[in-house]
Amino acid sequence: MRHLRIMSGILMFALLLAFTGIAQNKYVGAKFCGACHKAKEKGEAYAIWEKSKHAKAFETLKSKEADDIAKKKGLTKPASESPECLKCHVTGGGAATNVEAGFKKEEGVTCEACHGAASGYKMIHNKADGKEKAKAAGLKLNDKTDAKPCQKCHNDESPTKKEFKMAEMWAKIEHKLPPKK
């Protein structure tokens, strides 16, 4: 009887792990998004991102200044390898276990930092009836009134913190879809 309870507990735990693993979307990377979202009719989102500081976020970690900041914070690895830095300079924090093959940390802070890991919605979000299905599958549609996603990194913990002004920041990354004709 004791063994049955132990085995039941192990089985329940294994099932819980299996189902939470299935439900977790993976990051696909900006290049995947860019395949469609470069186009004018898609709001040129990829081009806007490519010119942004977000696209260069990982690159900044390769600088002497970033390594000096990391040392000052007591980190033993270079900034470009430190989880404490990667959590804000790479979408998904550089966690290699939650990514698809095309994902590259060198892309920095990508579409998925705001819109959620895309593996669950990448093939349905642009279909005629896909928006609601995509949202149910993990797509996040943010707007200029919601600073929470931004403030996960733009906050007092950042060693290079600057005053966070949502309206100004939003204007730099906003990518509206053109009205449908």
Question: Which residues are covered by each model-predicted region?
Answer:
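Short Gly/Pro-enriched loop/turn and capping motifs at secondary-structure junctions
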Residues: 118-119, 158
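Bacterial N-terminal signal peptides
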Residues: 9-18
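Short cysteine-rich clusters marking metal-coordination/redox-active sites
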Residues: 33, 85-88, 111-114, 150-153
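Sequence context of c-type cytochrome heme-c attachment sites
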Residues: 19-106, 119-144, 164-181
